Amino acid sequence: MNFVLKTILEEVRIRVFWILICFSFTWFTCYWFSEEFIFLLAKPFLTLPYLDSSFICTQLTEALSTYVTTSLISCFYFLFPFLSYQIWCFLMPSCYEEQRKKYNKLFYLSGFCFFLFFFVTFVWIVPNVWHFLYKLSTTSTNLLIIKLQPKIFDYIMLTVRILFISSICSQVPVLVICLLESKGVKTFIKNRRFFYSFFAFHSSFFYTPDIWCQIIACLPIYFIIELTIFYALIIQVYKKQLAL
């Protein structure tokens, strides 16, 4: 028992060590090219017509915070495949051959959905969101003149939040498959309040204190959870009818 525990702890230590090394190099690389990453995130907004391609900083440390935050978020996105691979290497030796095949399919599906949703969100959804917000920030009459001067940090954070919500949405197919295969739909329904509490806690920390912003941030996640449960129940009932 002690030998098995020591082996597991040694394996965890090795995996964590390589993750920390990779995280350090990735973060420094992302920070070195942070200006290029900021330009990529700002490109959907800069391509809007009749817009001055400039941002403003209202605080002395805002530029530094933007560079550090952008590099850190980019680091996590680049580190995600390596982190998933390390988790896969740690868990696979304890699985049977049939379980490995099933988990490999879920692993590939998760990665494919993640990058597909990320690409679609960045190319199509983010530009349309900023086009809509830009239209609301301009006036068509001379009675009231509103000129949009976006803050770079607020823009980056809002774009990242949209990408984060998209990343969570991308795992819905994987979650549905896991619920159907493990027959844990009832357990998920009973414990879904914990998911609601987690996302409410997340929105209170990472979003503005405005109640409407937090509601808008939580509603898509709540809708996805309910849609996942509804779809899993439909598939479960359909399989029971086929078995009769």
UniProtKB/Swiss-Prot annotation:
One GO term describing the cellular component: mitochondrial membrane
Principal localisation: mitochondrion
Keywords noted in UniProt: Membrane, Mitochondrion, Transmembrane, Transmembrane helix
Pfam families referenced in this protein's UniProt entry, alphabetically: TatC
Membrane protein topology class: Multi-pass membrane protein
InterPro entries in alphabetical order: TatC
Location in or out of the cell: Mitochondrion membrane
Transmembrane segments: 19-39, 72-92, 106-126, 162-182, 194-214, 215-235
Source domain of life: Eukaryota
NCBIfam families, sorted: tatC
Similarity comment text for this entry: Belongs to the TatC family.
PANTHER family: SEC-INDEPENDENT PROTEIN TRANSLOCASE PROTEIN TATC, SEC-INDEPENDENT PROTEIN TRANSLOCASE PROTEIN TATC, CHLOROPLASTIC-RELATED
Name of the protein in question: Uncharacterized tatC-like protein ymf16
Native organism taxonomy: Eukaryota, Viridiplantae, Streptophyta, Embryophyta, Marchantiophyta
